[in-house]
């Protein structure tokens, strides 16, 4: 008798970028309400504008239990955390949208893309301790040193020549 048992459906995260994959996952979760959704390599859902991320967030409402796993350090950008945490529970961070989250934890710089188009890019991050406190209430982190015996990293500098347009764009990013 499988009544009451947790249902597991395994699928590649990339499939959720497709209509067919999203539909299949939705049908499974809908018909098996006692389920768990686990996103491995959860940084694949860090872009709040991506179709895959939007689909994953829609699926969250059909999932009884939700978990995320990642081997990537959290420190790359605090903005990467919003949709990952939102998948787990949209109340964890206390923000109704990515933009309110970004405005709390990031100071941005307007970047001219040319042709009258602009985008906001992070200049620096603020209130990081506050964010870490929120994360500590629902996350668990293990470092490589705590679980793996790896040799020390080797670093080498690589210098790349840029053309004039690349140099100009690079300088805009550094501001």
Give residue spans per PLM region:
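Conserved motor-coupling elements within RecA-like helicase/translocase cores
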Residues: 1-9
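Hydrophobic "anchor" residues on beta-strands that sit immediately upstream
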Residues: 8, 36-37
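Inter-lobe coupling linker of SF2 helicases/translocases
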Residues: 10-15, 24-33, 50-64, 94-175
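Walker B catalytic acidic pair
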Residues: 40-41
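Residues immediately C-terminal
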Residues: 44-47
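Conserved helicase ATPase motor motifs in RecA-like P-loop NTPase domains
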Residues: 64-78, 86
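Conserved AAA+ ATPase core "coupling" helix
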Residues: 78-82, 102-103
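A short helix-turn-beta junction within AAA+ P-loop NTPase domains corresponding to the substrate/partner-engaging
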Residues: 81-97
């Amino acid at each position: 008798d499988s009544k009451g048992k947790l249902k597991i459906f395994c699928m590649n995260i990339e499939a959720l970028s497709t209509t067919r994959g999203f539909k299949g996952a939705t049908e499974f979760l809908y018909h098996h309400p006692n389920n768990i959704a686990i996103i491995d390599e959860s940084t694949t859902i860090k872009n709040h504008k991506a179709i895959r991320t939007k689909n994953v967030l829609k699926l969250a409402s059909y999932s009884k239990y939700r978990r995320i796993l990642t081997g990537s350090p959290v420190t790359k950008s605090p903005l990467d955390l919003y949709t990952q945490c939102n998948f787990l529970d949209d109340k964890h961070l206390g923000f109704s949208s990515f933009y309110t989250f970004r405005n709390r934890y990031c100071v941005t710089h307007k970047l001219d893309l040319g042709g009258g188009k602009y985008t906001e890019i992070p200049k620096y991050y603020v209130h990081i301790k506050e964010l870490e406190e929120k994360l500590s209430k629902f996350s668990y982190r293990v470092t490589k040193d705590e679980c793996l015996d790896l040799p020390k990293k080797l670093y080498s500098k690589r210098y790349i020549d840029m053309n004039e347009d690349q140099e100009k764009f690079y300088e805009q990013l550094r501001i």
